[in-house]
Regions:
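A contiguous active-site-proximal alpha/beta segment in oxidoreductase catalytic domains
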Residues: 1-44
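C-terminal catalytic/substrate-binding lobe primarily of soluble NAD(P)-dependent oxidoreductases
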Residues: 29-175
Length: 175
């Protein structure tokens, strides 16, 4: 026989397969769900964490930069639907502890509610999917968002000899 598999990256992909496996096990053991929160992220192995961001591009760099842009994050918390617009996304983070590691920044990942029926948890009062990044990432990234550095609605014409300083200065107000 021939097995055909499509690309099964992290998000969406492995995160959903892991979620379904856990939910199926809970149901098989007679359990019920009162809340569902799931975080994932392309985290750097400690021995390879050699930059201040604690991040390495493991997928399309443009998509990394635009992650979260385009629509508000949406989830439900205690029966109340929450919305986070992109310009606030990296300001509304939670700390997620993982044993053996420093705390991670967790932020809401797009529309969590569309997974309620897929996961079979339509009546659940809390459902949130999120992304993990190294602690401090969100504060730094939010600076770029607030400056407008992640806006792809225009083309910058700085020239081939432009420096990173020239790039950032282009977003700052006149002095």
């Amino acid at each position: 026989g021939l097995i055909v598999l499509n690309e099964m990256g992290l998000d969406p992909g492995i995160d959903h397969m892991s979620a379904m496996r856990i939910l199926d096990r809970i149901r098989a053991n007679g359990g019920t769900m009162e809340a569902f929160e799931s975080y994932c992220g392309g985290l750097v192995a400690p021995e390879s964490d050699d930059n201040l961001w604690g991040y390495k591009f493991s997928w399309n760099p443009r998509n990394v930069i635009l992650a979260g842009a385009g629509s508000s994050a949406k989830y439900i918390d205690g029966g109340i639907t929450k919305y986070i617009p992109y310009h606030k996304l990296f300001q509304r983070t939670v700390q997620v502890s993982v044993p053996g590691f420093d705390a991670f920044d967790g932020y809401a990942n797009r529309d969590s509610l569309k997974y309620r029926s897929h996961y079979g948890i339509d009546g659940i009062p809390t459902l949130k999917r999120g992304t993990l990044r190294k602690g401090g990432f969100s504060i730094a990234w939010d600076t770029f968002v607030q400056l407008g550095c992640t806006d792809d609605s225009f083309i910058m014409e700085l020239g081939a000899d432009a420096t990173w300083s020239d790039y950032l200065n282009a977003f700052l107000p006149p002095s």
